[in-house]
Amino acid sequence: MKITNTLLNAAALLAVTEAATITKFFTASTQTLFVTQTSQTVVATKSFVETIYSAPPKQLTSKTQDSTSPTTSSVNSLTSSSATSYVETTTPAPSSSTLTTSTISSSTASEDSDATPTADVEFAEEILKEHNVKRALHGVPALSWSNKLAEYAQDYANTGFDCSNLNLKHSGGPYGENLAAGYMGGISPVDAWYDEISMVDWNNVDFTESTGHFTQLVWRSTTQVGCAKMMCSTAWRQITVCEYLPRGNVIGLNVTSGHSYFVDNVLPPLK
């Protein structure tokens, strides 16, 4: 009888233990019980573009003024406190993050202009052609290719970006500069920049943060371009860097013409 009672007690203990386990399982939160997982990884691609704006060069001083370099889609600009002290020259203002005004001889405004790109000929020909296709729509002269600008662009494309946490930050060099990420080849970056035409107010052509790539692209007094690309992360794909000389997006009054630099250099499409 004692053995029977012992066996019954053991069986009861086992039943309680199993019941407790079952109770714990079925009272678990639904968040724990129902976890779904996708069987296929989807890679999202990203893209954005960036440009810079600068004040026109000032002839009578060599004072440097600091300015915060733009990031993501924001841009900054500098306007003259005295528009009449600025005159149009063929020399670009020297920096995106630091805007410098100085007396520069016009002979320094020209970089080497070479018909044959030094690297990635197919990309260079494609992106130069697309620049000039867009410029022709506005009746402004075609750009010529500069190996020096392209080499500068390539150096910055190779060293200026962290693909694990991409931030399109400008080089701060002496040229106009357009940046893009996520657009492949030589045509799609230019098309993305040109698409900003839809946001231009042709009754009041001026600086805006949303149209700077377009205005640099068609800037009449710009004569040379050099571009480069760098393959980045899977998400961002290609980074595109284009350098321009003389640089565009100059803010201020051209005392020679009596118009703003934007009115003189950003022309509406031909009809």
From Swiss-Prot:
Induction trigger: Induced by ketoconazoland fluconazole; and repressed by EFG1, RIM101, SSN6, and alkaline conditions. Enriched in the media of yeast form-containing cultures. Expression is also regulated by HAP43, SEF1, and SFU1.
Biased composition regions of type Low complexity, renumbered to the chain: 67-118
Keyword NAD: no
Gene3D superfamilies associated with the record: CAP
Signal peptide: 1-19
GO molecular function annotations of the record: cholesterol binding
Pfam family, one: CAP
Intrachain disulfide bonds: none
Domain SCP: 128-244
InterPro entries, sorted: Allrgn_V5/Tpx1_CS, CAP_dom, CAP_sf, CRISP-related
Glycosylation sites: 254
Compartments reported by the entry: Secreted, Cell wall
GO CC terms: cell surface; extracellular region; extracellular space; extracellular vesicle; yeast-form cell wall
UniProt keyword list: Cell wall, Cell wall biogenesis/degradation, Glycoprotein, Secreted, Signal, Virulence
Keyword Glycoprotein annotated: yes
Record-stated family: Belongs to the CRISP family.
Function: Cell wall protein involved in cell wall integrity and which plays a role in virulence.
Name assigned to this protein: Repressed by EFG1 protein 1
